Swiss-Prot record:
It comes from Bartonella quintana (strain Toulouse). It catalyses: (S)-2,3,4,5-tetrahydrodipicolinate + succinyl-CoA + H2O = (S)-2-succinylamino-6-oxoheptanedioate + CoA. It is found in: Cytoplasm. Coiled coil: none annotated. This is 2,3,4,5-tetrahydropyridine-2,6-dicarboxylate N-succinyltransferase. Its EC number is 2.3.1.117. Pathway: Amino-acid biosynthesis; L-lysine biosynthesis via DAP pathway; LL-2,6-diaminopimelate from (S)-tetrahydrodipicolinate (succinylase route): step 1/3. Substrate binds at R109, D146. InterPro entries: DapD_Trfase_Hexpep_rpt_fam, Hexapep, Hexapep_transf_CS, THP_succinylTrfase_dom1, THP_succinylTrfase_N_sf, Trans_hexapeptide_repeat, Trimer_LpxA-like_sf.
Length: 282
């Protein structure tokens, strides 16, 4: 197959002419899109990569490949439902045609009720409780995805992360220019928290239960007063909070507005030695 540079060129050109691409399209375009998704599925390439300077580089062409996949493939019966029922979709399961040897080689745990779509990568020693992992996502080694957590399209999850029950990580296929949601290594995301809109949770950070982080969320360090937008600093401990409301026209106190509050910052050694509950205690 073509190298990655050629693959990118073919997919970029095809995406520019995407209105002409149909389920009947064959040849180079179909082969390139399928090859790109297979590479994503194996973890040989990924939608976003962390650079040496700590910044994340997003390969937009891979997101385009995922979108082209929808144009190239018709709806189809997908087996595996409860009591022999089916689903109706364009994207097969990651586990289609897998046998015992495939699971042993992949070396991660997938509990019944888990859904992982083709092109998502799951690294060794990951534990997937009944959860949903969407296209193009990357989940690195030793991470726990707890019950009813959702990992959105192209989300990037680091090593030894804990996504608690009901956590939601947003997907970013559209708008196309959006960056993926990123959770770096050794983070803990508390139950029912949401991280969306391409926000980054930096290494070792702890989000308490019910923290919501989007691009408009103010993340306030209560010690320094510093305000962060779109990114939680490394080794921060974050809980839900609120900002005082502005006075209403009649002079009454207005409603408070949601924010996230950094209650403390810890170093790596403290983070490793201290339990999550102790970190979250004020």
């Amino acid at each position: 197959m073509t190298n990655l540079t050629q693959l990118e060129m073919i997919i970029e050109k095809a995406f520019d002419d995407r209105d002409s691409i149909k389920t009947t399209t064959k040849g180079e375009i179909r082969e390139s899109v399928e090859h790109a998704l297979n590479l994503l599925d194996k973890g040989e390439i990924r939608v976003a990569e962390r650079q040496k300077n700590g910044q994340w580089h997003v390969h937009q062409w891979l997101k385009k490949a995922v979108l082209l996949f929808f144009r190239l493939n018709p709806m189809q019966i997908i087996a595996g439902g409860v009591n022999g029922t089916y689903w109706w979709d364009k994207v097969p399961s990651k586990f289609s045609n897998w046998q015992e040897t495939d699971f042993k080689k992949a070396n991660f745990r997938s509990v019944p009720g888990t859904i992982v779509r083709h092109s998502a990568y799951i690294a060794p020693n990951v534990i997937l409780m009944p959860s949903f992992v969407n296209l193009g996502a990357f989940i690195d080694e030793g991470t726990m995805v707890d019950t009813w957590a959702t990992v959105g399209s192209c989300a990037q999850i680091g090593k030894h992360v804990h996504l608690s029950g009901g956590v939601g990580l947003g997907g970013v296929l559209e708008p196309l220019q959006a960056n993926p949601t990123i959770i770096e290594d050794h983070c803990f995301i508390g139950a029912r928290s949401e991280v969306v809109e391409g926000c980054i949770i930096r290494e070792g950070a702890v989000l308490g239960m019910g923290v919501f982080i989007g691009k408009s969320t103010k993340i306030i360090d209560r010690t320094t007063g510093e305000v962060f937008i779109g990114e939680v600093p490394a080794y921060s401990v974050v809980v839900p909070g609120s900002l005082p409301g502005k006075p209403l026209p009649n002079g009454e106190v207005g409603p408070n507005l949601y924010c996230a509050v950094i209650v403390k910052r810890v170093d790596q050694k403290t983070r490793e030695k201290t339990s999550i509950n102790d970190l979250l205690r004020d």
